[in-house]
Amino acid sequence: MMLLASLFTVVALLSGCAGTAGTPGAAASSPARRTPVRIATLKGPTGVGMVHLMQAQDAGTTANDYAFAVTAAPEDVVAKVATGDVDIAAVPTNLAAVLNAKTSGAVQMLAVNTLGVMYIVTDGVPLAGMADLKGRTIHASGQGSNPEYVLRFLLERNGLDPDTDVHIVWKSEHDEVATLVAGGDAEVALLPEPFVTAVTVKNPELAVELDLTTEWTKAVTDGSQLMMGGVIARRDFVEQHPDAVAAFLTEYAASIEAAKTDAETTSALCEQYGIIPSAAVAKQALPRLNLTFLAGEDMLAGLQGYFRVLYDADPKAVGGSLPDAGFYYTTR
């Protein structure tokens, strides 16, 4: 139990998904005067793709002059964007939509950086797909938020009634669910990374049976994707500094690619910059973080369907209304 407690202490901060460490800075030539850009990022999967750019900034090789703020609280990022204290922020995509609504369109979605990070973990229950959950008890957290909306949507798309065909036991925190499944007190659990890594390290008998990102792709026909993390910018900053925004996107794409291809360096940088407190946990979690870089039409096609699912479940999940076309930054 001491090991389990220490693992969960590490990961509890995180939930709220080819190159080298120098790749982001090398991707663009430095202008005569580097534009100051203030960036806020959340700890956990949403911030992992930023770490190589942070290292390049420390080395002085970036096109822009970046100042980074790392926080565990989404509300802190929202406040900084709303007050103009940051120019660019890495946040959950639905939070971006909410912030867009609250600020009357004062932010734009630049790119998606993370697909889904939610998984079905089981203790001796093999699953070929969502339909195999019929008759099962699922332990989960996140009732009234994205985990519930996504789970119910996927169950329904696979012919199951979430209220009668399965029994969902809602817990208040991810670590409660993790403790149950790791201790053998839950056969089926819905968990995000890096909690998935924590429980499978504690109990090697557990199996990661379903990736909800994959299950989403199998369930939809509209081209949407489970897109859970992205980067936004203040609209006035985009309009005043288009070249700086374009340079950021180029360097950020390179940073994400480096994070996907160099696990050793990435995990060390995650610990160094406080994105994930343990390099060991980061390294094991990386393959399931579903890091990506999708911008322009690719971002638009994937996000609109995802937002529609959230809106149909609860309009407040995306700020009360679906974002209009102006929310999506589509010029690079």
Could you tell me what each predicted segment is?
Residues G47-V51, V78, A82, T93-A96, ...:
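Extracytoplasmic/secreted envelope proteins and their assembly/folding machinery
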